């Protein structure tokens, strides 16, 4: 299983990383996309949406099931990856490049997992 060292993770199987503009990108992990199977639809939170850490903020649907996206941190959504509206399967092909939304954290990020901690969580 692919768990890049340069990312941070949530127990709800999201990865996050800062971008060059000081915002953070969020997407689902390789483990999550593997469990979901072939992804057919992504409902990202709209720009301007207020995020509350751990609360549902979007949805990923596959041919097998659907799964809520849970906000990784408190903050405000700044953009969504519009390409995923047309080609949601990009998440299956490249889960760590296919970010779902970007956001501006309300405060310094805390409570995120390192790659080693996420790997341990998965067992």
Curated annotation (Swiss-Prot):
Modified residues (N6-lipoyllysine): 64
Cofactor (UniProt): (R)-lipoate
Domain Lipoyl-binding: 23-104
GO cellular component: cytosol; glycine cleavage complex
Disulfide bonds listed in the record: none
Keywords tagged on the record: Lipoyl
Bound cofactor: record note: Binds 1 lipoyl cofactor covalently.
Coiled-coil stretches noted in the UniProt entry, renumbered to this chain: none
Any GO BP: glycine decarboxylation via glycine cleavage system
InterPro entries xref list: Biotin_lipoyl, GCV_H, GCV_H/Fam206, GCV_H_sub, Single_hybrid_motif
CDD domains per record: GCS_H (cd06848)
Xref: HAMAP family: GcvH
Assigned protein family: Belongs to the GcvH family.
PANTHER family tied to this protein: GLYCINE CLEAVAGE SYSTEM H PROTEIN, GLYCINE CLEAVAGE SYSTEM H PROTEIN-RELATED
Function text: The glycine cleavage system catalyzes the degradation of glycine. The H protein shuttles the methylamine group of glycine from the P protein to the T protein.
Protein name as annotated: Glycine cleavage system H protein
Taxonomic source organism: Methylobacillus flagellatus (strain ATCC 51484 / DSM 6875 / VKM B-1610 / KT)
The gene coding this protein: gcvH
């Amino acid at each position: 299983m692919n768990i890049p060292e340069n990312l941070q993770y949530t127990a709800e199987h999201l990865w996050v990383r800062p971008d060059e503009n000081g915002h953070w990108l969020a997407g689902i992990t390789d483990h999550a996309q593997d469990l979901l199977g072939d992804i057919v639809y992504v409902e990202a939170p709209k720009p301007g949406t207020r995020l509350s850490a751990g609360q549902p903020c979007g949805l990923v649907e596959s041919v097998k099931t659907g799964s809520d996206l849970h906000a990784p941190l408190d903050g405000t959504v700044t953009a969504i990856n519009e390409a995923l509206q047309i080609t949601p399967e990009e998440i299956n092909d490249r889960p760590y490049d296919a970010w779902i939304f970007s956001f501006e954290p309300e405060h310094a990020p805390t409570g995120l997992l390192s790659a080693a901690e996420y790997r341990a969580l998965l067992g």
